[in-house]
Amino acid sequence: MDRKELLSRPVRDLSITADTRLGDLMDQFSSIGGFTAAKIHEAYEIIKDMFSEDNTTFLSFPADIISTGLRGLINEVVKRKLVDVIITTSGTLDHDIARTYRNYYCGSFSYSDIELRDLGINRLGNVLVPDESYGEIIEEKVMESLEKLYAKKKEWATVDLIHEVGLDINSESSIIYNAAKNNIPVFVPGITDGSFGSQLWSFYEQHHDFKINLLEDEHRLSDIIFDAKKTGAIMIGGGISKHHTIWWNQFRDGLDYAVYVTTAQEYDGSLSGAKLEEAISWKKVRPDARYVNVYGDATVIMPVLLAPFL
């Protein structure tokens, strides 16, 4: 360790007013010291290079944030073509479709779930989802699309199916519509785990020659991975979305850039709690990669982190 180098960046006080822009605040975060703010700045710098270089950028996230207003931020990122590939869950399709046509409502974590059940209201954290805003509307819209797609051909890669359903939605408020419009592939490795997947099963029960080709999705992902000069990933939360992102990147010796936003901890034993450092041992992140783990609530961190790019 070099003493002079270690003492080269003094901690500086924040200087902010009501007119301070987020980009300026982000620059000040570089010398704030402390905890999350410094990590957010590091993530910002990594994402800035990720977006500016000849890099294939993955965006992975779970479904729950799409039930919140963060859907609008993700949608704007997709509209602006800031990312090249999305990897997410079946629930993302559910919430994106449902919220295109129906409202979800602000509530509380402390409401009685027994009473909510009796009222026909589902609780997702502090978001309230009435029965009529979820299953019924998803079934109606997905089944309409499946009938049309089945008439075209009997076997579909999931990524193509999502593309076509997105085009059918034809609403600027929809993530999968804008992804389809901008030719950003949306991969859902756990497609049957959700209402969208249940509609696929239900349709299959009536049309046994209807097939979903998941291996074609993996073939498409392999082409993306092996054609990429560099890869980077913005990963919000963990689970299958995060793992499928880093899993495929091991076949090119790992991600060159990685930003992981999470509240999970290593001691819970989950993939969500695993730091990016652990992924280096699996060759899912390169040893010389630029990466950072940012701990905190994505609904707070992501708007601050991404707003300067919008």
Curated annotation (Swiss-Prot):
Its EC number is 2.5.1.46. GO terms for molecular function: deoxyhypusine synthase activity. Transmembrane segments: none annotated. Pathway: Protein modification; eIF5A hypusination. Its cofactor is NAD(+). SUPFAM superfamilies: DHS-like NAD/FAD-binding domain. GO terms for cellular component: cytoplasm. It catalyses: [eIF5A protein]-L-lysine + spermidine = [eIF5A protein]-deoxyhypusine + propane-1,3-diamine. Belongs to the deoxyhypusine synthase family. HAMAP family: DHS. Catalyzes the NAD-dependent oxidative cleavage of spermidine and the subsequent transfer of the butylamine moiety of spermidine to the epsilon-amino group of a specific lysine residue of the eIF-5A precursor protein to form the intermediate deoxyhypusine residue. This is Probable deoxyhypusine synthase. It comes from Thermoplasma acidophilum (strain ATCC 25905 / DSM 1728 / JCM 9062 / NBRC 15155 / AMRC-C165). The gene is dys.
